[in-house]
Amino acid sequence: MAAQCGGYMNQSDPGSNSERSADSPLPGSEDDSPGSAAPHDPEWREERFRVDRKKLETMLQAAAEGKGKSGEDFFQKIMEETNTQIAWPSKLKIGAKSKKDPHIKVSGKKENVKEAKERIMSVLDTKSNRVTLKMDVSHTEHSHVIGKGGNNIKKVMEETGCHIHFPDSNRNNQAEKSNQVSIAGQPAGVESARVRIRELLPLVLMFELPIAGILQPIPDPNSPTIQQISQTYNITVSFKQRSRVYGATVIVRGSQNNTSAVKEGTAMLLEHLAGSLASAIPVSTQLDIAAQHHLFMMGRNGCNIKHIMQRTGAQIHFPDPNNPLKKSTVYLQGTIESVCLARQYLMGCLPLVLMFDMKEEIEVEPQCITQLMEQLDVFISIKPKPKQPSKSVIVKSVERNALNMYEARKCLLGLDSSGVTITNQSTISCPIPMNCHGLDILAAGLGLSGLGLLGPNTLSVNSTTAQNSLLNALNSSVSPLHSPSSAAPSPTLWATSLANTSNATGFPAIPHLMIPSAAQATLTNFLLSGVPNYGQNTPSPPPGLTPVDVHMNGLHSECKKVTSVLNGHVKPTNMKYGTISSSSLGDKVLNTNLAEASRQSNNHSSAEEVNSKTDSEGCNDAFVEVGMPRSPSHSANTKDLKQMLNSTKAPCPTRQTVKLLHGTKNSHLHTAERLLSDSEMSPTEGPMTDKKAPGSERAAERAAAQHNCEMARFTSQSAYGNMQAYDYEQKKLLATKAMLKKPVVTEVRTPTNTWSGLGFSKSMPAETIKELRRANHVPYKPTMSTTYENSPMSLSRSNSREQLGNGSDSDNWRERNGIDSSHNDYSSSIGSPKRKQNKSAEHYLSSSNYMDCISSLTGSNGCNLNSSFKGSDLPELFSKLGLGKYTDIFQQQEIDLQTFLTLTDQDLKELGITTFGARRKMLLAISELNKNRRKLFEPTNIRSSFLEGGASGRLPRQYHTDIASVSGRW
């Protein structure tokens, strides 16, 4: 390691070089060693180590100028006080070209040698804070980075205080070229040098001129217009004749640190040369990436490249590995913006190696190393150095994760700071400076910054939905993130930069810095909000549940809230979030009920009595949660919910009110064990699934719910409609079906505001819709219920303008709409929930949660579709199985239900269904449906007649959500 830091190549100890007399101690250069006594003394030791050349030169210079202690005095004092002999290069040439660190030799008894070394290194230490970083830079671009006469790289070395080494082997070896560049110095300087090198890289964009005629001449690069563009945007323009004579290739050259000007100049040139055809001409560029890194960068099944292409819209082509000529050239094609962005993302996937020394006495437990590797998404290797009292540490990762590599070093060495500030982060790793300090490390830990998920395009492309996406992220749970890298997603999130720890070794503090997985899920969804195909696409909450007047400047304040939560409330023992918001809604409403609820936690029979009693009194005791958050970080948004509650005249007497309040109170009720149990939920379960663990907590909440139901029986029920929950999954399914349905030419399509403000549209910006609705003062009223008492086909009891029928207030959908259940077969498939509950009341009440109950009713595999599924479309099937988030994947691949029934496990893997649980559900559903295929596809489909106008066809059509999706009437 020392040799690499000194010479940056694997060299032998420089004992035989020309500077031996100056840089290394010579026998007899100091006082004579203690004769023959040394060999006979078993405790006699000799130790040779390097010291910092610049510090030693400074000491000698200061002594020569009479401004400080001379080297002679310094070493003589140590020899006398420690009873050792020290040999040092007294004739060191000051200002020599050599950058090698000189050696010091200390002889004496073991304890004395150790003490002398510590005293010398306390003044002349060179390696305690020195690191070496190896990065990948295409060998074809080395000369461009170095500059004429080495001017570019010299300037970088001077400004960063680092030594930068380019491989010497490239000069002589024409067959194999090395792309590895080494940077050695202090961590902050090394990271700054890495960023500077990336900025010095050339940026070359190319496009083909359209063929306007056979005899069309190649444009003159010296023409006034082209020269004006070149000078204005600091680019070089050249033309290359194509081999087939007609047309030419335009090559625009610039620098990475001038990216915006290069893009503007290319656009101007394209418009000048192609005119109206400019927008149709693709732009291309290429990257030279070592062939051995291709598979690593592409990811498993090419997932990295697919994500980048989907994110940017550019096409990326990796070469055939068997092509001997251009096996390392990667081609990118698309619009100017997409090509440049994809190029940045690819560079963020390039490998990085960080090397540094660790003291021999520092011991690191293997489990701590494993924990660090998982949390920071890095690889760590620690090996002892031969014949030296130190260890060599190697940390490997990718460029987008550079900050976490320094975090790993900080933790391993027990430092107070990583030595790298956020301002040093590369524009390639993160294309925008982040306003939220706390999210920098979070983004790096999730491996997102390199993919631009926190870049300017996130804010610009998705700015129309940023308001809802932020709140939606904080108000919902997400399935575990599928990391774009081939490594498995880490179960927890590292937040060392968010906590102030000054522990000497750094390792006892590790458990203090672990954020619960529930909070990680919230933060993950916050980071991924608005980004297609990353995480779960949860629809935006309706205006009735979350405020719609949040503006983009609220993003910064929300970031601060999240950061403050993490800073103040990551505790080592019971990770409660009880003090997140002292004025939280749950504190004010439920604090009087908690004690009694806990006393009743073990009285299960009394809870069952209350269940049956409140059912008869109309208080709904279904176990489906309302669409409110469980996340600990939600308490920051309780103010808006309080305002909504205050607008109602009396509290709601239903279980829904209680569960709505529990949504904010859960963060105070549950410990770290409860939070961790949430994170172990199957990734195939939807966000509306009840995720509570079985046991006393369930009993306590149920008892509290029943108590609140009894207390609320005497209050008014006028505000019931305003507090109904909203079934996002069902709405999203119906919207998907409506969008997939082909319009019938002869059918009149009547516009309604059924889908207004829900964010399901894929063609119109949500912000525009909101502005129109605000301008027209159109209020939003929820139109569906999520309770189990109301079937999925239920109509809301709110004041919605779509509500029709006989005006009955009955809980039953058919009774309110005047439809006799005996007339249709489909109604029996969904059944009356009360009948279902009566048939299996014992089983229903003994289940720990809603999903347990449902699985007991449907069968062991959860795919008993004989009577419950008679549809013919894939979205409905996936929604029923809790796999709604995978619907878009199958729609993009144009896979319908018929094709789905032919898929195998391997087919599902190729489609990108990497989660085993999701694939298992799909395969079980395929098996079940294939068994009943003949019955499933019978021509008689009573459901359609039921929806279009009842079994007889004479009932008036009901213009509500379900019919809008099936009949095509909007």
UniProtKB/Swiss-Prot annotation:
SUPFAM superfamilies: Eukaryotic type KH-domain (KH-domain type I), SAM/Pointed domain. The keyword Iron-sulfur does not apply. Keywords: Developmental protein, Repeat, RNA-binding. Residues 9-19, 596-605, 783-810, 819-831 have a biased composition (Polar residues). Residues 869-932 form the SAM domain. InterPro entries: BICC1_KH (IPR054727), BICC1_KH-I_rpt1 (IPR047549), BICC1_KH-I_rpt2 (IPR047554), BICC1_KH-I_rpt3 (IPR047553), BICC1_SAM_dom (IPR037974), KH_dom (IPR004087), KH_dom_type_1 (IPR004088), KH_dom_type_1_sf (IPR036612). The keyword Mitochondrion does not apply. Residues 130-197, 282-346 form the KH domain. One of its GO terms (molecular function) is RNA binding. Residues 40-50, 606-616 have a biased composition (Basic and acidic residues). Residues 1-50, 596-638, 677-696, 773-841 are annotated as: Disordered. SMART domains: KH, SAM. One of its GO terms (cellular component) is cytoplasm. Putative RNA-binding protein. May be involved in regulating gene expression during embryonic development. Seems to be involved in endoderm formation. Ectopic expression results in endoderm formation in the absence of mesoderm induction. Belongs to the BicC family. This is Protein bicaudal C homolog 1-B. It comes from Xenopus laevis. The lineage of its organism: Eukaryota, Metazoa, Chordata, Craniata, Vertebrata.
